[in-house]
Amino acid sequence: MVFNVYYNGYYVEKKFSKEFLIHIAPDLKNSVDWNGSTRKQLRVLDKRAYRQVLHCNGRYYWPDGTKFVSHPYNKSIRTHSATVKRTDSSHRLKSHVVDKRPRRSLDSPRLDGYVLASSPIPHSDWNEELKLYAQSHGYDDYDDNLEDGEIDERDSLKSLNNHLDDLNVLEKQ
């Protein structure tokens, strides 16, 4: 006979929960269908091991500090409010107001006569478009606007290359 037990092993990996369960209840090692079990449902094959898992409920803690919880899987836990809601038989019928006005579809804007451009139409001169983009986004290349202490990147790379050529150790040997 197979007994299904709910346990809160969904916080950890399945392999760790298996080792943890074997540690707290040694009879589970050969009495559980580990391939058929999940991190929430344990399939116990032996009645003695089933009782042992249920006995461990609330007595042990997972490594993260949460209490070990186990109970029969088919038993549903109901709160008082859930029972009251189910027994309330006064169903109220709602009257639905139907709106007959046409709605604009968000999927196809062209059907309604609206045409949305996905991107702005560029100028006929691409160089002019690139210059405008560079100026508006700070990529413009003005050598005149260097502040005190700034070095032009092209000049600094040239001087670095010249300096590295002077320091070439392999040629001097």
Swiss-Prot record:
Skewed-composition ranges (Basic and acidic residues): 85-107
Species in which this protein is naturally found: Autographa californica nuclear polyhedrosis virus
Annotated protein name in UniProt: Uncharacterized 20.4 kDa protein in IAP1-SOD intergenic region
Domain of life: Viruses
Region (Disordered): 80-107
